Amino acid sequence: MNYGKLKNRPFSIIIVTGDFMKTIFKNCTLLDGTKDMAARENIDVAIENGKIVEIGSITPSVSDEVIDLSGKYLMPGLINLHVHLPAGGKPQNKPMKTTLLTKIALSSAISRELVLKMCHAYAMQGLMAGVTTVRAVGGLDNLDTRLRDKINSGKLDGPRILAANFAIGVPNGHMVGSVTRPAQTVADAVKMVDELKGQNVDLIKLMITGGVMDAKVKGEPGKLMMKADMIKACCDRAHGYGLKVAAHVQSPEGVRCAVENGVDSIEHGSTLTQREIDAFKKHNAVLVCTISPALPMAKFERETLGISEAVQYNSNIVYYNMILGSKTALENGITVGLGTDTGCPYTTHYNMWRELHYFEKNVGVSPAFALYTATLNNAKILGIDDITGSIEVGKCADILVSNSNPLDDFRALSQPYMVVCRGKIYKEPKIEKYEKCEYELDKYYD
């Protein structure tokens, strides 16, 4: 994870209208977010008080704000199930000193406020790219819930945030020293769940296996680090609080141990045998596919990333096993969601659209299913599909408008024409992108 510097704001916005005025989007081409969605032309959508209030052929009153979309494509805002708000995905060719940076970031009230502002800037970067809801699954102390609360109270603009705050891990485990706190014992881990409940988190995040960079030898990515008794104790305590548990898992053994001991959401994943398939179904667990951070590590020139041959070898294992796991899950009726693991090198808050493309291309789903997965399906995973995720009367006005049809080419989403979040309209948002990041990633868009 990297803490990139920002040049002023990484976005610019024009606010067209506020939350309470009735606004009618005339003449749009509607993609409603449902599984079998197809483009519907010449549709009007009305929003008022942050909600969608009418869909169809609408006659405006004299007091209504009317925006003629002239056939542009209107769809639900994207939902990213896996982000890390303290980092922006800046290209790098050497490891960051994340432990030292984290100590500095949390060392004083002033530094914490600066990091909070940075997290907000990254959240806004995602919003300007059409991501209206994020699930933050590993941050610095309680900064993610603080940012969530400021946005929810109206003090700041921003996407809807469901926050886990810091992740729970084990000594020498994945991301310890930055977004993960190590638990020495089962009792320590349970106390951390209690602490997180006190911070009013929306879910708990566990780091159960190592990651690619943690592997010490070739062929050993995703080594199981957290023992079953700790996993079960954390899940039992979290479930007692009504909180779901997401877990970083990058090996078959890790998937099995996590799901069988109560984890609700497997982040990244790996290949699945019948035992894991049965466990997913028994426990109603879901898999969150995150191809975005794996592709650069597996496919880029090693010199571009500054990684060893062993790291790239392990990255390829993770990359292909994650794709195979997602395919197997879908074939067996297991729910698969989408996230980006934003914060990893070359994985930015503004590139959720690329994850949809990777999902279509590598997992073999249709473009409509990919868009459904990133909208209504992701909302179902979060338990907020009654609030957002599709264009339906009564739901929040979380909307993305593109100039062309994303079902023909997901690059249509790379620069939205308009974004609406809980009724607030942002027209022609501009995003400051990392040129090197876009240059390298575009090589693998086909």
Feature roles, as predicted:
Residues 5-20:
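Short, Lys/Arg-enriched N-terminal segments with co-localized hydrophobic residues
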Residues 16-43, 48, 58, 105-106, ...:
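Active-site microenvironment of metallo-dependent hydrolases
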Residues 58-75:
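Active-site metal-binding motif and surrounding structural segment of the metallo-beta-lactamase
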Residues 73-150, 229:
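Metal-associated gating/positioning segment near the N- to mid-region
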Residues 104-117, 174-191:
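Active-site mouth loops of central-metabolism enzymes
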Residues 108-112, 119-144, 158-169, 201-215, ...:
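Divalent metal-dependent hydrolysis catalytic cores, especially in the metallo-beta-lactamase
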Residues 210-323, 337, 342-344, 364-365, ...:
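Active-site core of metal-dependent hydrolases
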Residues 240, 307-310, 319-405:
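His/Asp/Glu-enriched, well-ordered alpha-helical/loop segment
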